[in-house]
Amino acid sequence: MKVHIFTYGCQMNENDSEIVKQLLKDEGIELTDDENDADVVILNTCAVRKKSEEKVYSHIGKLRKKGKKIGIMGCVAEKEKENLFKRGVSFVIGTRALTKVPDAVLNAKNGNKQIYLEDTLDEIEYHKVETRSSNHHAWVTIIHGCDRFCTYCIVPYTRGREKSRPIDEVLKEVESLSQRGYKEFTFLGQNVDAYGKDLRDGTSLAKLLKLASQIDNVKRLWFLTSYPTDFSLEIPKVMLESEKVARSIHLPVQHGSDKILKAMNRRYTRQEYIDLINEIRKIVPDASISSDIIVGFPGENDEDFEATVELVKLLKFERLNLAVYSPREGTVAWKYLKDDVPYQVKVRRMSYLLNLQKTINKELNKSYLGKEVEVIVEAQAKNGLFYGRDIRNKIISFEANPESIGKNVIVKVNKISAGPLYGEIKKILD
């Protein structure tokens, strides 16, 4: 029996798929990269946006026509549960029941519908996961779930409450991977700054970054995603202490209006967010700060939108992820707040912010022209150029060869844009 896994959504889903592939391999189950060659296709799904969920249902329909056995894991599995059986799905795996996938696959041939929603995360031996999507970079999930319950967000309902992995276990995984040649690590969590709080033993993200940076062969450490009221100023201090900790912080603000922030249940004010960014920049002046903003949340008027525009102009984010609000069934906003901003208005406002951010990006990127920076070569793009990121998460494209992937190189930037930078390799460091 051959199995194919298709992954939608976030980096944590990528990591979950890597773990499941290892679990299947350990049971002697064959994996295939070709969906058409598979007997069983597992979709690791995303439900953050309605569009993401619709893509999953479309994919299920195509797989049914091909006669495939279908397994669903990820957030859609947790959200829809038994309802997925009506769509012809063979088994459903909850976000914390990853270890049940091999049993589900082996039992799929008998035609019985299966659903596993229990928490078996403690059974996973993370340090033994060898099936990674990269040969030099590894996703490392350090905390599952979220306790913040923003009114628009489905994640607390699909990923559960916050649950941290013991710090020794995480460090063991990083150590094991570093011995196998991995040099770059991204610590993952829906609210990564909450890491360790539930353990009540002094564990924190700052402590983890400090200890992981002391491991031989580790070259760079990243973390995603931060929440403003949980973010500790110890983290930028660790950035100053270790050149291995990337000077990049993704800190979603979601909106610039206090009225909308309150309706979102974001637990901070506009000014508190501004003060936090200013404090971070006092400690690490060249810190790269990116953010997320939702456009068209219920009740957003012109004044609210203008507050967001002014915030973006003031803080000058390095990157900005924009999304048009769409109600998610089961959330507080879906239940109690009318989706009253016309779609055309949402699109117009998002377009305005996109153009504003492009202008900011181009202005910020000017400081890179003629500069030499160290990057780790990641991969080759469709245009034939290779690319990598510097310590501030700036993407730089350049000519190289496949043998350079995973290597540290010095690149001189000779061209800028509102997006990636362009340059040439001046020196290979390893």
Swiss-Prot record:
Pfam families: Radical_SAM, TRAM, UPF0004
Chief localisation class: cytoplasm
Cofactor(s) the protein needs: [4Fe-4S] cluster
Residue sites binding [4Fe-4S] cluster 1 per the record: 10, 46, 75
Top-tier EC class: transferase
Domain (MTTase N-terminal): residue spans on this chain: 1-110
Residues spanning the signal sequence: none
Keywords per UniProt: 4Fe-4S, Cytoplasm, Iron, Iron-sulfur, Metal-binding, S-adenosyl-L-methionine, Transferase, tRNA processing
GO MF annotation: an example: metal ion binding
Location in the cell: Cytoplasm
Binding positions for [4Fe-4S] cluster 2 per the UniProt entry: 146, 150, 153
Co-factor binding comment: Binds 2 [4Fe-4S] clusters. One cluster is coordinated with 3 cysteines and an exchangeable S-adenosyl-L-methionine.
Enzyme Commission (EC) number: 2.8.4.3
GO cellular component terms given for this protein: cytosol
Domain TRAM: 366-427
Domain Radical SAM core: 132-363
Origin superkingdom: Bacteria
Catalyses which reaction(s): N(6)-dimethylallyladenosine(37) in tRNA + (sulfur carrier)-SH + AH2 + 2 S-adenosyl-L-methionine = 2-methylsulfanyl-N(6)-dimethylallyladenosine(37) in tRNA + (sulfur carrier)-H + 5'-deoxyadenosine + L-methionine + A + S-adenosyl-L-homocysteine + 2 H(+)
Binding partners and assembly: Monomer.
UniProt similarity note: Belongs to the methylthiotransferase family. MiaB subfamily.
Function, in words: Catalyzes the methylthiolation of N6-(dimethylallyl)adenosine (i(6)A), leading to the formation of 2-methylthio-N6-(dimethylallyl)adenosine (ms(2)i(6)A) at position 37 in tRNAs that read codons beginning with uridine.
NCBIfam families, alphabetized: miaB-methiolase, MiaB/RimO family radical SAM methylthiotransferase
HAMAP family attached to this UniProt entry: tRNA_metthiotr_MiaB
Protein name: tRNA-2-methylthio-N(6)-dimethylallyladenosine synthase
UniProt organism field: Fervidobacterium nodosum (strain ATCC 35602 / DSM 5306 / Rt17-B1)
